[in-house]
Structure formats: C-alpha cells, structure tokens
Curated annotation (Swiss-Prot):
Annotated segments matching region Disordered: 1-26
Assigned protein family: Belongs to the BLOC1S5 family.
A Pfam cross-reference name: Muted
Name of this chain's protein: Biogenesis of lysosome-related organelles complex 1 subunit 5
Coiled coil residues, start to end: 154-186
Keywords: Acetylation, Albinism, Coiled coil, Hermansky-Pudlak syndrome
Recorded disease: Hermansky-Pudlak syndrome 11: A form of Hermansky-Pudlak syndrome, a genetically heterogeneous autosomal recessive disorder characterized by oculocutaneous albinism, bleeding due to platelet storage pool deficiency, and lysosomal storage defects. This syndrome results from defects of diverse cytoplasmic organelles including melanosomes, platelet dense granules and lysosomes. Ceroid storage in the lungs is associated with pulmonary fibrosis, a common cause of premature death in individuals with HPS.
GO CC annotation terms, alphabetical: axon cytoplasm; BLOC-1 complex; microvesicle; transport vesicle
Function summary: Component of the BLOC-1 complex, a complex that is required for normal biogenesis of lysosome-related organelles (LRO), such as platelet dense granules and melanosomes. In concert with the AP-3 complex, the BLOC-1 complex is required to target membrane protein cargos into vesicles assembled at cell bodies for delivery into neurites and nerve terminals. The BLOC-1 complex, in association with SNARE proteins, is also proposed to be involved in neurite extension. Plays a role in intracellular vesicle trafficking.
Superkingdom to which the source organism belongs: Eukaryota
Subunit structure: Interacts with BLOC1S4, DTNBP1/BLOC1S7 and PI4K2A. Component of the biogenesis of lysosome-related organelles complex 1 (BLOC-1) composed of BLOC1S1, BLOC1S2, BLOC1S3, BLOC1S4, BLOC1S5, BLOC1S6, DTNBP1/BLOC1S7 and SNAPIN/BLOC1S8. Octamer composed of one copy each BLOC1S1, BLOC1S2, BLOC1S3, BLOC1S4, BLOC1S5, BLOC1S6, DTNBP1/BLOC1S7 and SNAPIN/BLOC1S8. The BLOC-1 complex associates with the AP-3 protein complex and membrane protein cargos. Interacts with BLOC1S6.
Length: 187
C-alpha cells in the first residue's frame, strides 16, 4: 500500500531475526512511521481530490479550447464563404445595377441641367429686355420731361399774353358798360 517504502506486517509485530531492545523500539517507531505514511497516502487518495480535479480541469480546458477552436473555425469558414459569395455574386450585381442606374440618373441630371440652363438663359434674356425697355422708357420720359420743361416758358408766355388780352377786353367791356350805365343814369 505504501508508495515505495517497506511494508510491515499487520499487528505491529517485530521483524524476524529478533533484535535487541533498542532495535525493537526502533522497529516500533519505524512501523509507526510507515503506518502514518500509509494513512497519509490513504487520506490523500480518498479525501484529497486536487490531482483529480486538476486533471479534470486540464481535460475540460483542453476540450473547451478544441470545441471553441472548432466553433471559431466554423464561424471563420462561414465568414469566408459569405465574403466569397459577396465578392463573386452580390458585388457584381450591385456594380451592374449601379452602373445602369447611375447612367440613367446621369442622363436625367444632364437633361435637368440643360433645362435649367435654358430657363436661366431665357430669364436673363427676359430681364435684359425688360431692363433695356425700362432704360429706353426712362430715357423717353426724360426727353418728354425736358421738352415739357422747355415748352413751359413759351406756354406761360402765351397764357400770360392771353390773360393780358382777356384783361384788356374785360376792361374795355367794363368801360363800355360804365359808359352805358352812365347814359342810363342821366335820365
């Protein structure tokens, strides 16, 4: 039962060959030592589970790492397949769709840009015509105003002359009326 020591017979009998008293006391002490050693081994085998637990722990960690490694390998393989499918199928489809759509969008944008440029050009031409018309109209009004202001002294002179003539006629008329009235008042 002991690991590497000598076994003593059960019952603590002395080893054959007899011995002196000193030897018997040593033999008993040696036997007790062996018994204690055997009890320690029995205790460690029955009650000390550290080596077993350490072995089980190592085994569990090894299995976990293997399974984890396999699981990670499966995940990496799935990712690799997904990336391969994306590169082989999805990206070319997307690229072709984008090319078709982008060319249509580019054509539409170009047409819209041309329309906007034409509208802007028409608007600028209309504004220029309107501005030219306003400038011409303003010049015409200024010429008319200048002519009007130039004619004013002549018209004023004419009006003043007509007024003076009308006043003279009225004076003459009132003078005649006074004469006629004076004729009638003498009666």
């Amino acid at each position: 039962m002991s690991g590497g020591g000598t076994e003593t017979p059960v019952g603590c009998e002395a080893a054959p060959g007899g011995g002196s008293k000193k030897r018997d006391s040593l033999g008993t002490a040696g036997s007790a030592h062996l018994i204690i050693k055997d009890l320690g081994e029995i205790h460690s085998r029955l009650l000390d589970h550290r080596p077993v637990i350490q072995g089980e722990t190592r085994y569990f960690v090894k299995e976990f790492e293997e399974k984890r490694g396999l699981r990670e390998m499966r995940v990496l393989e799935n990712l690799k397949n997904m990336i391969h499918e994306t590169n082989e199928h999805t990206l070319p489809k997307c690229r072709d769709t984008m090319r078709d759509s982008l060319s249509q969008v580019l054509q539409r944008l170009q047409a819209a840009n041309d329309s906007v440029c034409r509208l802007q050009q028409r608007e600028q031409e209309r504004k220029k015509i309107h501005s030219d018309h306003l400038v011409a109209s303003e010049k015409q009004h200024m010429l008319q105003w200048d002519n009007f202001m130039k004619e004013q002294p002549n018209k004023r002179a004419e009006v003043d002359e007509e007024h003076r003539k009308a006043m003279e006629r009225l004076k003459e008329q009132y003078a005649e009326m006074e004469k006629d009235l004076a004729k009638f008042s003498t009666f």
